[in-house]
C-alpha cells in the first residue's frame, strides 16, 4: 500500500493493519442466547499530497482492493484543504526501539466455560437485591489480535494484544419505578477481570 501510494503521486503515506479474532457468549435468564465467533481484519491508508491529507480503509486485502483504497484516499486528498500541521513525524523523531507493553495474554477458555462465567455474572447481579426483577443478560468476550503501523519514512512496528471482558445488565423495580443498572470489567489478561 505504501509503495502504491508513492507510485501514484503521494508525497508521504502511512498504513495501519489490524486483525482480531474472538468469541462472545451472551446469556439471558440463565440460558445461552448467542455465541458469536469474530474474525475482523482491515487496513487504513493515510496519504499526503504536500500538506493535504486523506484517509481510506478496507477489509479487503486483495491487490485490486488495496489499489482502489489508495486511489480513493488520493482522490480525497486532492480536494482537501492543505494544513501546515499535516505530515509524518520527522524521521529522527520516529521510535526505533519500541517498548514491549505486555498487552498479549490469550485466555484459554472454552465456549462452555464462557457460558458458565456469563451465567455466574448474571446470577450474581440478580442476587444483589430483591428489587432486581429481570435481566438484560450477561456477556463474556475474549479477543486476541495484532496491530502494525508503517510509513514511508521507514517506520514499521506493531504489537499483539488481547482484550477480555464480562458484562451484565439487570432491571430493578420498586414502588418508585424501574431502573436499569449494569456492571462491566475488562482487561488485557483474564486475571485482571473482577
Positions of PLM-derived features:
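Active-site bordering "gate/hinge" segments
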Residues: 1-194
Amino acid at each position: 500500500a505504501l509503495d502504491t501510494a508513492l507510485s501514484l503521486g503521494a508525497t508521504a503515506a502511512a498504513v495501519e493493519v489490524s486483525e482480531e479474532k474472538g468469541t462472545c457468549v451472551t446469556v439471558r435468564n440463565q440460558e445461552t442466547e448467542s455465541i458469536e465467533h469474530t474474525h475482523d481484519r482491515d487496513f487504513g491508508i493515510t496519504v499526503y499530497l504536500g500538506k493535504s491529507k486523506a484517509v481510506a480503509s478496507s477489509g479487503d486485502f486483495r491487490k485490486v482492493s488495496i489499489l482502489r483504497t489508495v486511489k480513493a484516499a488520493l482522490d480525497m486528498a486532492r480536494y482537501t484543504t492543505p494544513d501546515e500541521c499535516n505530515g509524518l513525524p520527522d524521521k529522527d523523531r520516529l521510535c526505533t526501539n519500541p517498548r514491549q507493553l505486555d498487552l498479549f495474554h490469550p485466555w484459554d477458555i472454552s465456549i462452555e466455560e464462557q457460558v458458565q462465567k456469563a451465567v455466574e455474572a448474571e446470577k450474581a447481579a440478580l442476587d444483589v437485591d430483591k428489587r432486581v426483577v429481570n435481566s438484560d443478560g450477561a456477556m463474556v468476550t475474549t479477543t486476541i489480535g495484532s496491530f502494525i503501523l508503517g510509513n514511508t519514512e521507514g517506520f514499521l512496528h506493531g504489537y499483539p494484544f488481547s482484550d477480555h471482558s464480562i458484562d451484565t445488565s439487570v432491571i430493578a423495580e420498586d414502588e418508585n419505578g424501574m431502573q436499569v443498572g449494569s456492571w462491566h470489567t475488562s482487561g488485557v489478561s483474564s486475571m485482571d477481570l473482577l
